[in-house]
A protein has these predicted regions:
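Short amphipathic alpha-helical segment within the helicase RecA-like ATPase core
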Residues: 1-248
Length: 248
């Protein structure tokens, strides 16, 4: 998934955004988030809540197509619980629900316009990171060693996160979030590899490759260096394998 930060205001409005889908939050008390209100120009979202088509419970969803007054092809209503001061748990549930819905859409791009500044005891950077990491979790496939790999995820491939302003600090937070998510997925992938593949030598190679790609230093100690450092406990464990020990 490709992520970006998109700021909306009175001139560059959410309603005018041309995209495959906009995800906005609604609440159990039949109240609309600010983004939902901005799209509810003809009362269709309010009507959907009043009719009971969506409960507003965290993770509930309702897809509306061709909503009057909006340029988006689809509007996804996502429940975020009872409290407009959103809990961390409810925010993550809503994000996961939106991502699940995105995966089954014919659209290729979308906007997540959630109340990212209303999560209890969390800041905007946390909300951006939560969205990115949830996406990485949803897309991860443990199929590296399968003879037939799982098909690539369909649906939405580009997501813009709506925020009050696209500041350099927020863009840096997005870049950091993507890096964290990629690192988590690399860790999962290494952990899922069979031990005859993911050997100490293999791990050392991965470390050196990362160092070359991202410009940091890495040192890999071999058996002689470990003996010189008197790392007896480490070497004792390594004696149980034919593979040469490496300490990264």
């Amino acid at each position: 998934m490709d992520f970006s930060i998109k700021a909306f205001d009175t001139k560059n409005t959410l309603a005018a955004a041309k995209t495959g889908c906009v995800a906005v939050a609604v609440f159990e008390n039949k109240k609309l988030s600010a983004a939902a209100k901005a799209l509810d120009q003809h009362g269709d979202i309010t009507a959907a809540l009043k009719s009971g088509d969506i409960s507003g419970k965290a993770g509930s969803t309702l897809l509306l197509r061709g909503l009057a007054g909006t340029s988006a092809q689809r509007v996804l209503l996502v429940g975020m619980g009872a409290d407009e001061t959103v809990s961390e748990k409810n925010f993550v549930s809503a994000v996961n629900a939106a991502l699940k819905a995105f995966a089954s859409l014919g659209a290729t791009d979308a906007i997540i316009a959630f109340p990212v500044e209303q999560v209890k005891e969390r800041d905007l950077n946390w909300a951006v990171r939560a969205i990115v990491i949830a996406s990485n979790d949803a897309e991860f496939r443990a199929d590296r060693q399968k003879s037939k790999r799982d098909p690539a995820p369909a649906g939405v491939r580009k997501v813009a996160i709506a925020t009050p302003a696209a500041t350099p600090a927020l863009k840096a937070a997005l870049a950091q979030s993507i890096a964290i998510g990629n690192g988590m997925n690399l860790t999962r992938e290494l952990g899922n590899l069979s031990p005859n593949v993911c050997t100490p030598t293999y791990l050392a190679g991965v470390a050196r490759e990362l160092a070359g790609d991202y410009g940091f230093d890495v040192e890999v100690l071999d058996r002689k260096q470990l003996e010189a450092l008197k790392m007896g406990s480490f070497l004792a464990v390594a004696k149980g394998s034919e593979e040469a020990p490496k300490f990264i």
